[in-house]
Amino acid sequence: MLSAQLKQQLQSIQALQQTLEEETACLKEKNFSQLSAILLKKQKLLQAVTELDKVLSPAKIQDQIAQSEDLLALKNEIEQQLAACQKINALNGRLVELSMKSNNLLMQLIKQATGKNSITYDQKGGLNSASLLGRNIKA
């Protein structure tokens, strides 16, 4: 029974890792249409992992795992997979941060472009702050 529970936990964590990789791809490609479904799937997997961890965490069960080479090997594999998930999740957090900064910068530029003293652009697409769309022309 313990072996089956550990295998189930490993499968859940492997599915979580795959989901995190899908999340990474969505964030890199800025494909936000699929992101909501991926986040829901991620939440369900995290919940399943947490619930099974509660079942497997009592000291009595941990002692049984420690006494069996097979169970201990499964536990070690689970811990390695979990560490990989944590690394991917940290990367995804950084991607979200960078995306938010990029969006904030874009919003500032759009606000400037639509403001009273709008900035114009030169032939190369660069900002040309010298001309404020002819507002100060007297002739």
Over which residues does each language-model region extend?
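Extended, charge-rich alpha-helical scaffolding segments
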Residues: 1-77, 84-87
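Short terminal interaction segments
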Residues: 74-139
